[in-house]
Amino acid sequence: MSSTTTAPALADLPRAIRERDAAAQAALYADDAVLTTIDAEHGPSNPVVLRGRAAIADALADVCARDMTHDPTFFVHDDELASVGVACRYADGLRVHCLAAMRLRDGLIAEQTTVQAWDS
């Protein structure tokens, strides 16, 4: 008898983002995934680069623990690519908007580039 494992459904990403479910989000990444983040403090020449599901899971746990809302504004995907927009708002009113583009492998996120714009 053989057993097979099924990758978590990428279609669950908007719910996991909205509900700040870091574990469900992390489960959508490949073990060797690379997450690159570009923002005002880390431009294209010096982005934040996280390598591996464990590092990405730690970052997601930090973000999801913050007192803020996460509202997915759009989400599209096929077998190879995905993209999501997320409007975030901290309790003090500060807003952040994130756009992410992802390359998929075997139903999991293998590479992601996120661009963040923060209120100043």
Language-model features: locations:
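Short charge-dense sequence patches
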Residues: 3-15, 48-53, 109-112
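A beta-strand edge to alpha-helix "cap/lid" segment located at domain peripheries
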Residues: 2, 58-120
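Short, low-complexity N-terminal intrinsically disordered segments enriched in polar/charged residues
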Residues: 1-27, 31
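A solvent-exposed, acidic/Ser-Thr-rich amphipathic alpha-helical stretch
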Residues: 3, 24-78
